[in-house]
């Protein structure tokens, strides 16, 4: 009997501990907790792409004088090569979801200690404001090689709604797709490129209780294709779907 009581007490304590942890205000998050929301959470994922084409290139060998010419060798000779695999990480996030905005604001607070009270208040309003009429996906790009990163950023920064509206969409598990409404290239705020979709379709939310998961796809052509799937059952906040 004592053993059963001890087990029940242990479960109760764990439940209370988890509840307290879940209620921790975003303004008290640590950097690690904010990064977790931004990179590995129900609302955020990181797509990792590895390019191994540079691993076997010899920068000291000029294909123009060595006989056989490898594909794109002129360009690679002029630009140089890393002789190693390059990594590109794409942060794909539901920016319209409050936890993501809160994590971004918390990171700014941690990095900039001396913020004016009115600035802090504006940040709080921005972080806690419910999403209204749009689903916003943001994408950031980070890389280990400046040349590879620069090439991708050029594509991302020069893209426009017209070139992406037929190749970027949200797809529900039932196959229904919602195509891009507006694309906004990345700016100086650090939030990344914005993919904006209407929240309502035929006077109904595109994502509702009957939907189990949603996939975000953005095809920039041969240079970049993003494809991430999110489970709606995990995207709950205070008992409601948050996106």
Question: Where in the sequence are the language-model features?
Answer:
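PEST-like low-complexity, intrinsically disordered acidic/proline/serine-rich tracts
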Residues: 20-243
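Bacterial N-terminal signal peptides
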Residues: 6-15
């Amino acid at each position: 009997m004592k053993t059963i009581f001890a087990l029940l007490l242990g479960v109760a304590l764990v439940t209370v501990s988890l509840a307290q942890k879940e209620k921790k205000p975003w303004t008290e998050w640590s950097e690690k907790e904010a990064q977790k929301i931004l990179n590995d959470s129900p609302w955020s994922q990181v797509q990792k792409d590895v390019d191994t084409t540079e691993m076997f290139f010899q920068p000291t060998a000029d294909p123009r004088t060595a006989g056989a010419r490898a594909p794109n060798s002129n360009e690679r000779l002029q630009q140089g090569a890393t002789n190693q695999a390059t990594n590109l990480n794409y942060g794909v996030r539901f920016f319209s979801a409050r936890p993501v905005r809160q994590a971004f604001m918390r990171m700014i607070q941690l990095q900039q200690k001396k913020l004016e009270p009115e600035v802090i208040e504006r940040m709080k309003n921005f972080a806690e404001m419910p999403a209204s009429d749009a689903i916003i996906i943001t994408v950031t790009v980070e890389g280990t090689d400046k040349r590879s990163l620069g090439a991708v950023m050029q594509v991302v920064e020069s893209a426009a709604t017209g070139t992406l509206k037929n190749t970027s969409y949200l797809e529900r598990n039932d196959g229904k797709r919602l195509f891009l409404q507006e694309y906004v290239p990345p700016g100086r705020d650090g939030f990344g490129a914005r993919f904006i979709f209407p929240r309502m379709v035929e006077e109904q939310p595109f994502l509702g209780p009957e939907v189990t998961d949603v996939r975000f796809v953005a095809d920039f052509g041969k240079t970049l294709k993003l494809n991430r799937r999110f489970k709606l059952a995990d995207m709950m906040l205070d008992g409601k779907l948050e996106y």
